[in-house]
Amino acid sequence: MANNFKNAFATSVSTTSGSPTDVYTSNNGSACNSILIELDVANTGTSAVQVTVLIRDSSANAAFHIVKNAPVPVGSALKVVSGQKVVLNGNDKIQVYASAATVDVVASILQDVT
């Protein structure tokens, strides 16, 4: 089976912890997973921001922090996941919110892993 790589993007992310921006939702299927390979956040604004990245586990109906309130200076980016891998089961989500909406997110994902 060929590898199925995908990039997921978000811009102007949520500023509310109660309704974070969904960057990616893993494929639904008991035999399929996705692997988060890299996740970068960039501050596109004129002030420093704090960024929170979560994995929402659909089976537990709970969210778990990858990073919480990480500072990202003006004109900078933060490599949240780089090198290590995070397995996402069916319907798990990558979610992001920040102290200002001036954040872009890029995620690189390997889909349909059995």
Predicted regions and their residues:
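Short active-site-adjacent structural elements
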Residues: V49-Q50, A62
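Hydrophobic beta-strand residues in large extracellular and virion-surface proteins
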Residues: V51-V53, I94-V96
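Short edge-strand/loop segments of extracellular domains
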Residues: R56-A60, T114
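Intrinsically disordered, low-complexity Pro/Gly/Ser/Thr-rich segments with frequent PxxP/GP/PP motifs
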Residues: S59-K93
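C-terminal interaction-tip segments
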Residues: M1-N33, E38, Y97-T114
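Short solvent-exposed strand-capping/beta-turn motif centered on an Asx-Ser/Thr pair
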Residues: V41-T46, S99
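Beta-strand signatures of extracellular beta-sandwich domains
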Residues: T52-R56, V106-S108
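A generic structural signal for short beta-strands and their flanking turns/coil linkers
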Residues: N33-I37, V49, K68, G90-D92, ...
